[in-house]
Amino acid sequence: MSVFRDLVEGECSEPNALGNFVQHFTNERSYHDKFEDHGKNEFYDSLYRHEEEYNEQRHLDSIFDGEGQEDDIHLMMDRHLNLRDGPREHKELPLSNVESDLQFLFQDFINSTRAGQLFHPSSLNHLPLTFEDKSKIKNRSSIMLKHFSNGESEQFEEDQLNRMLDSLGIEVGDDFDQVWDSQPHHTTTTTTTTTTTTTGQYDQYQKYVNDLPEEYEDYEQHQQELFDDGDLEDYELDEEWDKGDDFHPYDSAWTESDRSVEAAWDETARRTISDITRPITQINDPKLKKSNFMKFMNQLNSGEASIVGSDVVHNPDFKRQEEYQQQADQWTEDYNDFHEHIPQHRIQEYQFSIQEARDSDTLERGMGLFNEGHLSDSIIALESEVKRNPENAMAWMYLGIAHAENDQDSQATTCLIKSLQIDPTNSKARLALAVSHTNDYQKERALDTLEEWLQRTPEYTALYKQFKGSVDPNSFLDTWSRHEFTTNLFIEAARSRPSNPDPEVQTALGLLYNMSYDYDKAVDCFKAALQNSPTDYQLWNKLGATLANSNRSQEALGAYFKALEHKPSYVRARSNLGISYLSLNMFQESATTFLGAIAIHPAPNIWDNLKMVFRLMNREDLVQKADLRDVNAFLDEFQFM
């Protein structure tokens, strides 16, 4: 079933490890959603586009128009692995999420096209794309599809393109040339100025649109000649395309996503060091301010020093490089000390939803509400508990888990870090933190946390030290090399228990393989974990989401049913189940499932999913009813209670 079977037994698979479990079921999510969530959003269209804050529009325009491209767009590639499922509650969407979502959307589009698999994007139709943005995306998508498709059918290419456009709220049938002609004035907003498009700009834009087919034909002919000569690699083809074409940062999203992963991470480090170091230099901690580490961060931020490859290079106008080299050990020590201070700094950022603790809201009440699926109420109760008892590590952990299930991973991360600060031995909290880091696009931190989990687990401490000892501490690993190292580390941990798999190790491996899109291997790992944790509802949901992300929605149904069997109030599994039904064109079942989820937790994104199903059913009357946000209004037609 999976190439992972070729590895030694006991890694992520063993005899009878739930191998064909889905055949027993006849019923039944960030980046690409949270890996716990179903990759469902190819169905979203422009009906649900939401207007963002004015500043976000300006920021997005600056990305497309070339301003600020040195600021943070490349940092986002390191910070945002798009594994989300469903439209975010983007009311407070950080500006930095916009370009990262586009980056990974383009990368997933290319990767899935190359693999000959249908695209499963997250919905980004809430982004405030301008008319020109949409036109460029549509044309560029068509070209890149032709470039990377490996002889797939026309139907596949059409479906693939439609899924890409739907995810951004771009109507497939839009005639941009005609619409443009009908608009006498076209205004482009940037971060610094607002200008009206001139006739010359229009002519240039019109020429760009009209010339694309011919340009692409010439490009493809030239490309074939180079291929025949055997002189051109994939990345060189993109460079040929880029010649003579002044790409905006949008276009760089295409080219960045098609370079080698290692080069992309190196470019990220090179171009965004100022953004990485600036917030560190602003930490108001007297001990850190006097440290050599903070001095080094200030030098990187000011340009006194820079990172080239794996070396630190200093400006010759400043102190000699040899002097700084002698301080390397001290910097390392200061950096470790910095990590000890970071948790307290982050916990100060936690945003409480209550002002005062309520006596009736205890840990027990919060846990009860959580188990019943009342996430918002459970969060309030758990906040009361940690306000009364700020050293209650268990309360902080469950508050973090509740936030994670409520799709609030930044808040979850803060709570879980606080829990681990109080009790570093809590392996459940550390593994949950790794998941939230992944969901919040913090890949490096997810890898750090997974390695910390292994290091702090007595059974694997010796293995961890042995592995770390084999790596040159002065060597530089880009993120994907680091990912490979961490994966191999957990593979060895899994091999140490061939006949009795550790479900936590297998879960970590499933997470790592989801990061690298190795869904078959991830499926094997989750199945092996379930053999020893058959009642873990979150694990069943992870399995279902991974199956769905690998275009196996029919199999995913069974996994979601098992998750709900063990926790009927698990809203995320209900939502994912509704999406799987939708993927299979089972609209009645999908609507019923979404209504059941809303009855437990009326999240706006689930209402949006429901309205989309009603539109696919051609039931505008139900769409209007859904706008009232009254779930009881559907009891006469749907049995969901």
UniProtKB/Swiss-Prot annotation:
Summarizing the function annotation, the protein's role is: Receptor that mediates peroxisomal import of proteins containing a C-terminal PTS1-type tripeptide peroxisomal targeting signal (SKL-type). Binds to cargo proteins containing a PTS1 peroxisomal targeting signal in the cytosol, and translocates them into the peroxisome matrix by passing through the PEX13-PEX14 docking complex along with cargo proteins. PEX5 receptor is then retrotranslocated into the cytosol, leading to release of bound cargo in the peroxisome matrix, and reset for a subsequent peroxisome import cycle. In addition to promoting peroxisomal translocation of proteins containing a PTS1 peroxisomal targeting signal, mediates peroxisomal import of proteins containing a C-terminal PTS2-type peroxisomal targeting signal via its interaction with PEX7. Interaction with PEX7 only takes place when PEX7 is associated with cargo proteins containing a PTS2 peroxisomal targeting signal. PEX7 along with PTS2-containing cargo proteins are then translocated through the PEX13-PEX14 docking complex together with PEX5.
Family classification: Belongs to the peroxisomal targeting signal receptor family.
Subunit-structure text: Interacts (via WxxxF/Y and LVxEF motifs) with PEX14; promoting translocation through the PEX13-PEX14 docking complex. Interacts with PEX7, promoting peroxisomal import of proteins containing a C-terminal PTS2-type peroxisomal targeting signal.
Task: Return the protein name.
Answer: Peroxisomal targeting signal 1 receptor
**Provenance organism:** Dictyostelium discoideum (Social amoeba)
Q: Where is this motif: WxxxF/Y motif?
A: 331-335
Q: Locate the region Amphipathic helix 4 (AH4).
A: 261-288
Cellular component terms (Gene Ontology):
cytosol; peroxisomal matrix; peroxisomal membrane; peroxisome
Q: What Gene Ontology molecular-function terms does this entry list?
A: peroxisome matrix targeting signal-1 binding; peroxisome targeting sequence binding
Q: Where does the record place the region Amphipathic helix 1 (AH1)?
A: 12-34
Localization (cell): Cytoplasm, Cytosol; Peroxisome matrix
